[in-house]
């Protein structure tokens, strides 16, 4: 396969096969593609619209070149958002991962520093005293013993650094933004995946299906890359190779509505303070409900289908400080 041929195809508005896309992105990750070539390719893909085969090929390239994580044989999930919704809310999926782990569900959360919001998952975890840059073996130990680990994307996908200069100059969403949530190095086959726009719900759902996930749920919540407490959440549930599309309201979870303003966050220290209060059993009502609906949905990927019952379990837990203990335990893994 020739790099020049692939670039020519892209510039002639032709879609790549999965194998061609994988080859191209392996070259990118290995540092064999110039900034000019990469910029041209990413723009060509974006303007035409990336196909499922092209995204899946890029995912396979990322996995083929990633630092290995010793994947467990037990059931575990990931909870992640694409980011880029522009709303600067508190880190709901990070808090939900800690809560789910406290309830006994194993979560290997993949994430990175903030790209578009003030505070990404690793930013808030660092502010909470967690070392996000632990080795794969230590992370696996944390997952085994404490039901929770955080996999810091730059440690596992070091080759993505070759795309950083181009991404910074382009300042627009590219295929790399699509990739982030799909390349968990633990190869999670259960996932709650929040997306920044209703337009990309279907492409994510179909890509997740092509990656043979066991039970994953893609959501967009009225402007948020989360299940929302202020409006309708659009859902694509992928199970046994089938996709079911439906929508949910806060009432379907048995909670009252809250304004999006009630979920606003800020710098890492501010978000860390709010999450600490929540985990200690002193959370604000809107924060409790936002984490409850997202954790409830994550529990569903483990077969816990009753969303109202799931929410109640979370709310009962968040009236105690047990989830804070999980966070403190996680801080011991250095």
Curated annotation (Swiss-Prot):
Anthranilate 2 binds at residue 167. One of its GO terms (molecular function) is anthranilate phosphoribosyltransferase activity. Mg(2+) 1 binds at residues 93, 226. Pathway: Amino-acid biosynthesis; L-tryptophan biosynthesis; L-tryptophan from chorismate: step 2/5. Homodimer. GO terms for cellular component: cytosol. Keywords: Amino-acid biosynthesis, Aromatic amino acid biosynthesis, Glycosyltransferase, Magnesium, Metal-binding, Transferase, Tryptophan biosynthesis. Catalyzes the transfer of the phosphoribosyl group of 5-phosphorylribose-1-pyrophosphate (PRPP) to anthranilate to yield N-(5'-phosphoribosyl)-anthranilate (PRA). Its cofactor is Mg(2+). This is Anthranilate phosphoribosyltransferase. Binds 2 magnesium ions per monomer. Anthranilate 1 binds at residue 81. Coiled coil: none annotated. 5-phospho-alpha-D-ribose 1-diphosphate binds at residues 81, 84-85, 89, 91-94, 109-117, 121. Belongs to the anthranilate phosphoribosyltransferase family. NCBIfam families: trpD. Its EC number is 2.4.2.18. InterPro entries: Anthranilate_Pribosyl_Tfrase, Glycosyl_Trfase_fam3, Glycosyl_Trfase_fam3_N_dom, Glycosyl_Trfase_fam3_N_dom_sf, Nuc_phospho_transferase. Mg(2+) 2 binds at residues 225-226. It is an enzyme of class 2 (transferase). One of its GO terms (biological process) is L-tryptophan biosynthetic process. It catalyses: N-(5-phospho-beta-D-ribosyl)anthranilate + diphosphate = 5-phospho-alpha-D-ribose 1-diphosphate + anthranilate.
